[in-house]
Amino acid sequence: MTDMFRLDGKVAVVIGGGGGIGEIMAKGLAGQGSKVAVASRNMQKLEAVAQKIQSETKSEAAAFQVDIIDKQSVAQLVKQVLSKFGTVDILVNSQGANVKKPAVDFPVEDWDLMFQVNVKGTMLSCSEFGKVMIEKKKGKVINLSSVRGIRATLWGGNEGYSATKGAVDMITRSLASEWAPYNINVNALAPSLIYTELAAVTLRDPERLQKYLANVPLKRVGQPQDLVGACIFLASPASDFITGQILYLDGGLTAVG
């Protein structure tokens, strides 16, 4: 029986692939045989990641610079990827911005930044790469959401971030419905607290971390590697009958509250 999780011959684009969760997922997809295009602003980081992926997985990888909140830049990225690889089968939107400030003292510019990157960036990426997938009548889109899209925290400062992730959830569900006739699956990964730079504030506070883990059945913080299997699943033929779903990677957090 053919391995349903193999991605041989596929081309994946990972936005935000220059580090953190995006880099880990890009490497995971490449490990299953997919060619990978990593894209973000920092070309130096991207080139290092692409070289590392090629060295460790033997799959072809390329780096592309993009400003995800600029439509022309995203459209140019699509052209560059098509010129390099000929097609796009998988799109992963792993870009993200997270600023925590009290609601009564929340700078408008920080609010705008999160909505620009998390919401506008996701929609622009889906829109531009979606054109390619609609034409070929096949594709897999994986957005990066968060449990914060449906669940408040025990402490403040998450109003902006939570609102953007709720928006990502609805972009995901709406596109899943709109693009179903074109055989395009649109889903989202929604992790809880993951060991990344964005989670540093919580991880540095033992009391806050203890309160958080009290509500997590598996009693640990997630690792970037915990997202890889789910990403491969949603990118692979194994998930062909799954669309419009938000997959929670949270150690059981949303199951108990």
What are these regions (language model features)?
Residues 2-4, 231-232, 243-257:
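Short C-terminal tail/terminal secondary-structure segment
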Residues 18-20:
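Conserved glycine-rich cofactor-binding loop
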Residues 43, 65-77, 108, 225-226:
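The beta1-alpha1 cofactor-binding region of Rossmann-like NAD(H)/NADP(H)-dependent oxidoreductases
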Residues 102-103, 107-115, 141, 208, ...:
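Substrate-binding pocket helix/loop in short-chain dehydrogenase/reductase
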Residues 126, 164, 172:
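Active-site helix of classical SDR
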Residues 131, 177-181, 240:
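Alpha-helical segment proximal to the catalytic Tyr-Lys
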Residues 146:
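Residue(s) in the substrate-gating loop at a strand-loop-helix junction
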